[in-house]
């Protein structure tokens, strides 16, 4: 409860703005690409924690259930997606507080996973992952690079000259990025956010 009170209304600004709430595999399949999260804000009431993600000009608000998943509609570039959000607080081996979120896209059979580390009051670090994710994509990549015979000569030649380990590292960095954020103060902190819980079903 003490941590929630301290977080209430706090805004953090992303150092890297290339990561979005939408899973990478869904961005590709739906041709619906993220604008990248620029700021994140925490709010809470007596029962729930809310997290506002400012992505482009849009505010995506998720309600987080601790005992049961919270159902939330997310509008991504005009397309509606139903999510189930479950969260829990814990600590890592160094005693750092960690908020773990599981954001399941119910109708898509995909899940966005987020761990938010709170090393101190002025900084957070967000570690992203998704399911299906790194393992499936890297396994597919390995099959391709081993030579399928279905590649165009240009792609085949290109794959021959790019080390597989380098490709895997780049893919891992894209699917499982770690982004640092700094606490904002002053009147500009809330600029851009639209405060609403209309998309939260409960």
Task: Kindly give the residue locations of the regions a language model identified.
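Peripheral terminal and inter-domain segments
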Residues: 1-202
């Amino acid at each position: 409860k003490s941590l929630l009170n301290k977080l209430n209304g706090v805004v953090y600004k992303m150092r890297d703005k290339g990561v979005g709430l939408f899973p990478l595999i869904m961005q590709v399949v739906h041709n619906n690409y993220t604008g990248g999260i620029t700021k994140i804000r925490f709010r809470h009431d007596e029962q729930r924690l809310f997290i506002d993600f400012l992505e482009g000009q849009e505010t995506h608000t998720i309600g987080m259930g601790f005992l049961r998943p919270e159902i939330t509609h997310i509008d991504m570039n005009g397309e509606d997606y139903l999510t189930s959000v479950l969260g829990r607080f814990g600590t890592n081996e160094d005693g750092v507080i960690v908020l773990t979120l599981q954001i399941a896209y119910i109708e898509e059979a995909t899940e966005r996973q987020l761990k938010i580390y709170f090393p101190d009051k002025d900084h957070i670090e967000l570690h992203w992952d998704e399911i299906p994710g790194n393992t499936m994509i890297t396994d597919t990549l390995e099959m391709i690079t081993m030579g399928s015979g279905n590649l165009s000569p240009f792609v085949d030649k290109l794959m021959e000259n790019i080390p597989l380990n380098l490709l895997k590292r780049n893919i891992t960095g894209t699917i499982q990025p770690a982004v640092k954020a700094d606490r904002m103060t002053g009147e500009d902190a809330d600029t851009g956010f639209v405060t609403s819980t209309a998309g939260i079903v409960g």
